[in-house]
């Protein structure tokens, strides 16, 4: 069987002479039409430091593919900057961009009958978007992460972008002055690369490494280091090898590999967004995975890494002491990882990890020893109760108070809530409710980093709870609960909460409860009316019509009557 299994449909035979004529115009010669055509989905953009270095990586991968005997074809895909759009209407487009990225890659690869796909991405939605496309396509595929930004430094402490969001809250609370805020702003982002803590981008790059669709050790490299460029080139070579072996994406994307990815996310202390994205990738791969699987795995996997936002270190620190392979080796030795899962390299997880030390270096505390973890169980808890019949996600590390019962402070949009926090209207003991921010209601399920950072900055992180049908940034920590489902826009109980109602968040009991009688809830439900759509034309209107519940991954190709 030839290596150009798909592209031969557009390159072989007299009837394909017009096709070849066009390909000659973009660099194909007589001897190139039997070579596999390899797509390079390039997310390069100067919108954001996360993606500003991707062009060079795509070029290195392109050259390596060509040298290995493939015919690379570069095409663009989009990105939006979560950090820049955060706290604005623009953030409604962030999760939408995941679908646009997935759809665009799938569209180009299938339209051009490409034999393999290498995707280069950096900002948060690039990773799940590319993986969703790879899962749908089920062809040889590999992901190249753009790499993490190095930390900024100011007054002897490491800074990340989250430092600036929290500084806004400190400034509003009078804890720092305008000069201090400006200096933190100036020093937080010293170069290119994705946000530096174990936020969403680094969480998802690590999950992809655990899934076997990126090179071992590549997910925590700094964007500006030469090893990242070398890794991009090697990824191109590995992809051509995978095409020759017909090693396709779904051979890696199995039930066991998703369990591995969840275990790694828990051990790293990763972002709540991993729940949403892994559910969506699994759905695209036709792998049964539910929100409850995260809770099952959480209960047996400890948090081993002391990483921001709730910890002390950043991704480059993790890389320095062994990176994701070191964490995976520890999980494998503890029986918490499936070593027989295949990777795009052709090796199993166990084979990839064979030469990794059993324990991390002794002279560091980024990765804790297994007998002395940072936390004995994972940090992404799935809560249920009458406020979240379909479930919700709580991040329960880095908090002193694991439960709260307090009066609801209800806001129907993020902006209203942020103004209340910054003006001092939120008090210790309050439970903030931000609703109509779900996948359909927002639409787009905005991340609530601005309100949560303002709460932290105001010194209320240990005394105020926050629940939302929106999402949280990977930079969020505190007593926060997101992805509440059903969401307000479809009549979920969160829509029925009234100002001053008693709400309980209990991380240990995994409970999210509105302390109102069933009779009163029934009365409110009977009186509730759905709100008219916020958008009636354009991409947000289309997204609101198509998107599923957050408990199902907020996907846009799950249709009525389809089982979970």
UniProtKB/Swiss-Prot annotation:
The keyword Transit peptide appears for this protein: no
Catalysed reactions, as listed in the record: (2R)-2,3-dihydroxy-3-methylbutanoate = 3-methyl-2-oxobutanoate + H2O; (2R,3R)-2,3-dihydroxy-3-methylpentanoate = (S)-3-methyl-2-oxopentanoate + H2O
Purpose: Functions in the biosynthesis of branched-chain amino acids. Catalyzes the dehydration of (2R,3R)-2,3-dihydroxy-3-methylpentanoate (2,3-dihydroxy-3-methylvalerate) into 2-oxo-3-methylpentanoate (2-oxo-3-methylvalerate) and of (2R)-2,3-dihydroxy-3-methylbutanoate (2,3-dihydroxyisovalerate) into 2-oxo-3-methylbutanoate (2-oxoisovalerate), the penultimate precursor to L-isoleucine and L-valine, respectively.
GO BP, sorted A to Z: isoleucine biosynthetic process; L-valine biosynthetic process
Native species: Chloroflexus aggregans (strain MD-66 / DSM 9485)
Key word Membrane present: no
This protein's UniProt keywords: 2Fe-2S, Amino-acid biosynthesis, Branched-chain amino acid biosynthesis, Iron, Iron-sulfur, Lyase, Magnesium, Metal-binding
InterPro entries: DHAD_IlvD/Edd (IPR050165), Dihydro-acid_dehy_C (IPR042096), DihydroxyA_deHydtase (IPR004404), DiOHA_6PGluconate_deHydtase_CS (IPR020558), ILV_EDD_C (IPR056740), ILV_EDD_N (IPR000581), IlvD/EDD_N (IPR037237)
Subunit structure and binding partners: Homodimer.
Entry GO MF terms: 2 iron, 2 sulfur cluster binding; dihydroxy-acid dehydratase activity; magnesium ion binding
Active-site residue numbers: 473 (proton acceptor)
SUPFAM superfamilies: IlvD/EDD N-terminal domain-like, LeuD/IlvD-like
Pathway: Amino-acid biosynthesis; L-isoleucine biosynthesis; L-isoleucine from 2-oxobutanoate: step 3/4; Amino-acid biosynthesis; L-valine biosynthesis; L-valine from pyruvate: step 3/4
Chain sites annotated for binding Mg(2+): 82, 124-125, 447
Annotated binding of [2Fe-2S] cluster, by residue: 50, 123, 195
EC number: 4.2.1.9
Tree of life domain: Bacteria
PROSITE patterns: ILVD_EDD_1 (PS00886), ILVD_EDD_2 (PS00887)
Designated name of the protein: Dihydroxy-acid dehydratase
Family: Belongs to the IlvD/Edd family.
Cofactor note: Binds 1 [2Fe-2S] cluster per subunit. This cluster acts as a Lewis acid cofactor.
Cofactor(s) needed: [2Fe-2S] cluster; Mg(2+)
Top-level EC class as recorded in UniProt: lyase
Residues with N6-carboxylysine modification: 125
């Amino acid at each position: 069987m030839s290596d150009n299994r798909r592209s031969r449909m557009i390159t072989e035979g007299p009837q394909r002479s017009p096709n070849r004529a066009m390909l000659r115009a973009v660099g194909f010669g007589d001897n190139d039409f039997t070579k596999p055509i390899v797509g390079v989905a390039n997310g390069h953009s100067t919108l954001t430091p996360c993606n500003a270095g991707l062009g060079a990586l795509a070029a290195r991968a392109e050259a390596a593919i060509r040298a290995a005997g493939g015919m690379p074809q570069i095409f663009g895909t989009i990105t939006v900057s979560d950090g820049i759009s955060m706290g604005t209407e623009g953030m409604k487009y962030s999760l939408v961009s995941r679908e646009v990225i997935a759809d665009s890659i799938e569209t180009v690869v299938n339209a051009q009958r490409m034999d393999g796909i290498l995707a280069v991405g950096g900002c948060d939605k690039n990773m799940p978007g590319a993986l969703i496309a790879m899962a749908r396509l089920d062809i040889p595929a590999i992901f190249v992460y753009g790499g993490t930004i190095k930390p900024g430094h100011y007054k002897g402490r490491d800074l990340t972008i989250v430092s600036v969001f929290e500084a806004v809250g400190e400034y509003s609370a009078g804890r720092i002055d305008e000069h201090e805020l400006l200096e933190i702003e100036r020093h937080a982002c010293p170069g290119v690369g994705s946000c530096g803590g174990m936020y969403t981008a680094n969480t998802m790059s690590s999950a992809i490494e655990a899934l076997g669709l990126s090179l071992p050790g590549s997910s925590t490299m700094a964007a500006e280091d030469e090893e990242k460029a070398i890794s991009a080139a090697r990824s191109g070579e590995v992809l051509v090898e995978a095409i020759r072996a017909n090693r396709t994406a779904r051979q890696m994307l199995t039930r066991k590999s998703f369990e591995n990815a969840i275990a790694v996310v828990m051990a790293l202390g990763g972002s709540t967004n991993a729940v949403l994205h892994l559910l969506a990738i699994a759905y695209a791969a036709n792998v049964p995975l539910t929100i409850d699987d995260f809770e099952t795995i959480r209960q047996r996997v400890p948090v081993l890494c002391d990483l921001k936002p709730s910890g002390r270190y950043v991704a480059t620190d993790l890389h320095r002491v062994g990176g994701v392979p070191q964490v995976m080796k520890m999980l494998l030795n503890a029986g918490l990882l499936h070593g027989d899962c295949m990777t795009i390299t052709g090796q199993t997880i166990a084979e990839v990890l064979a030469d990794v030390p059993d324990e991390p270096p002794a002279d560091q505390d980024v990765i804790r020893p297994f007998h002395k973890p940072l936390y004995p169980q994972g940090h992404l808890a799935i809560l249920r109760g009458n406020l979240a019949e379909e479930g919700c996600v709580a991040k329960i590390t880095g908090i002193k108070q694991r439960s709260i019962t307090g009066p609801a402070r209800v806001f129907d949009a993020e902006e209203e809530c942020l103004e209340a926090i910054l003006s001092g209207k939120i008090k210790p003991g309050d439970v903030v409710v931000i609703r109509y921010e779900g996948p359909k209601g927002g639409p787009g399920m905005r991340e609530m980093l601005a309100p949560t950072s303002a709460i932290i900055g105001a010194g209320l992180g240990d005394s105020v709870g926050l629940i939302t049908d929106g999402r949280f940034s990977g930079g969020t920590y505190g007593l926060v609960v997101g992805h509440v489902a059903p969401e307000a826009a479809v009549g979920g109980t969160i829509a029925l909460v009234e100002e001053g109602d008693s709400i309980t968040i209990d991380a240990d009991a995994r409970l999210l409860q509105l302390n109102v009688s069933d009779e009163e809830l029934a009365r409110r439900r009977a009186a509730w009316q759905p709100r008219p759509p916020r958008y009636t034309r354009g991409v947000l209107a289309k997204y609101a019509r198509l998107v599923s519940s957050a408990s199902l991954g907020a996907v846009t190709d799950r249709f009525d009557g389809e089982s979970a």
